[in-house]
Amino acid sequence: MTDKNIIAGAPTEEPARQQYFMEQVKKLVEAESAKKGRPLTCFINTFGCQMNARDSEKLLGILKEAGYEEGTDENSDFVLYNTCTVRENANLKVYGRLGYLSGVKRKNPDMMIALCGCMRQEPEVVAKIKKSYRHVDLIFGTHNIFKLAELLYERFMEKKMVVDVWEGTNEIVEELPIERKYPFKSGVNIMFGCNNFCSYCIVPYVRGRERSREPEDIIKEIEGLVADGVVEVMLLGQNVNSYGKNLEQPITFAELLRRVEKIEGLERIRFMTSHPKDLSDELIETMKNSKKICSHLHLPLQSGSSEILKRMNRKYSKEQYLALVEKLRAAMPDISLTTDIIVGFPGETEEDFEETMDVVRKVRYDSAFTFIYSKRTGTPAAAMPNQIPEDVVKDRFDRLLKEVQDIASEVVKRHEGTVQKVLVEEIDTHEDSFVTGRLSNNTVVHFAGDASLIGKIVDVSLDEAKGFYYMGSLVK
């Protein structure tokens, strides 16, 4: 059958179309493998957030279904960079890796290099790749990762760079293969895109508008995961609190959580990220009454100054954020709160910075991701006046980091001497007679154990707090 006949014979409906192209690519991969006398390998390098990590599991699932074996490094036959573009230097990292790969490809001209993810959604980036990195074979974006097999087939046939970047889509393709990193826990996308347009953030421009999956599809996926041995799921979205608003039959995130809670065999439910402006009383009540939702909430602050929050377009004030924390603590006194904070946003004064420090002292976070403001081309904040001098930002960042770490080391101690449930995740990276796991509140615990414990929830005595983690002992 000719190439044209194969494409003409492809189903038009998804996911049948992609299943068809996976089969076609598999024939090509098997033929190449026979020629080389070894299996063709693939390697995915993932940059950025948990949404990207989950996307990479889907991409790897497609590649393995299409006949590739997973390789260990960039010397593989098919190398894919799933990119992040939240910060400008994330782009520079990828350009650096592409420069390195040009040498690798000279030695192995049959290898293929692909780029996808948020960085690919920027037209100027795609133009630069096409001009300066001609050894790249495949470029696609965030909206059409499900089309990898079809695009790969096109590249095999055309033998030239394939570019397929969509500006936006409402399409969500279900039931494609996924290769999970962990057999006992999994991320689950419940929605895609973002409608918030924070003035410093590129995400709505590269991930598109909010699109929610149907609750039935989410439940079906989680039931399948549980049947396959998963005990913990992480529900993922740029702003999970907005889930369900754009569905034909609207549903709240709290209602979705209550449905997920009913799935037999599922032990733990996590979710991220929550936008403070959309955190409802219904959600707080659902968390309070749940036996499965973990005792942890990531609630990005970004700044403690109401003036800076206004410029960031965050749509809440310092006072509203603190009132929300008060509600959460009243409902769940033991809840672990973590956050994101940006230092040095344009126009931030010393007084604004002290407002942030004040919130940190009042909330007492278990941990915080702290960032120096990074001017992001294409966002309103990049053009704002009063960009802060580097030395001032560095000084504030160091002061904030010390405050966060000092408080966190005190807060984490609160369970010292108690026995808690721990989901064991892996062999300890520093001591192979120990294992590492997490409490419901996401704190890491190290204790003596072996691989037979991985994936199990066990009782552990938290013997000693060591800053951000515990040393413990298994309760037999």
Give residue spans per PLM region:
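Generic beta-strand/beta-sheet core signal
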Residues: 45, 203, 236-238, 272-274, ...
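Terminal RNA-binding accessory module
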Residues: 2, 383-476
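Proteins enriched for Cys/Gly/acidic motifs involved in redox and nucleic-acid/cofactor modification
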Residues: 1-236, 241-243, 282, 297, ...
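Conserved SAM/AdoMet-binding glycine-rich loop
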Residues: 110-117, 122-124, 227-350, 361
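Short flexible coil/turn linkers enriched for glycine and charged/polar residues
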Residues: 181-184, 194-196, 293, 303, ...
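Radical SAM enzyme [4Fe-4S]-AdoMet core and its adjacent flexible, acidic
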Residues: 49, 244-265, 312-315, 375-406
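Hydrophobic C-terminal alpha-helix "anchor/cap" residues
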Residues: 63, 129-130, 260, 287, ...
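Conserved, mostly hydrophobic/aromatic
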Residues: 198, 218, 235, 271, ...
